[in-house]
A protein has these predicted regions:
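Core of folded catalytic or high-affinity ligand/protein-binding domains
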Residues: 1-126
Length: 127
């Protein structure tokens, strides 16, 4: 978490970024946090049991029920998707409704390694 916070500060303090680029890169970071730490799941693969990772899920009984129904394929509204950092950072979210997707990671190490080896995705400088 500390590295995510530091990256956010670095984006804000980067003098090469216009305000629009700062917003754009922070939005990518926000999407990353949203789909992993807020609304993520953890499982070795799609055929194993899932555990709730995200605090946004844990804080809502409706969200918990939605995840359970999605895992059991009893719900056509939300899908379970294997984590991919590019997919995650470019996917917007709606905080006012149940989530239409939940990404799952294999492990915290996998998530951290993915984040730390793809920092450039959060440092877009424009065309």
């Amino acid at each position: 978490l500390r590295d995510i916070g530091r990256l956010g500060c670095n984006i804000l303090e980067n003098m090469e970024f216009t305000d629009n680029l700062k917003f754009h890169n922070l939005k990518r970071l926000q999407n990353f946090v949203w789909w992993t730490l807020e609304f993520g799941l953890i499982a070795e693969n799609i055929n194993t049991s899932f555990e709730i990772l995200g605090s946004g899920i844990l804080s809502s009984i409706d969200e918990i029920n939605n995840v359970i129904k999605s895992i059991k394929y009893e719900n056509k509204y939300s899908t379970i998707i294997k984590y991919d950092i590019e997919n995650v950072v470019f996917t917007c979210f709606d905080y006012s409704n149940l989530q239409d997707r939940y990404y799952y990671i294999e492990s915290f190490d996998y998530l951290y390694n993915s984040f730390s080896s793809n920092i450039d995705i959060f440092l877009f400088k424009g065309d």
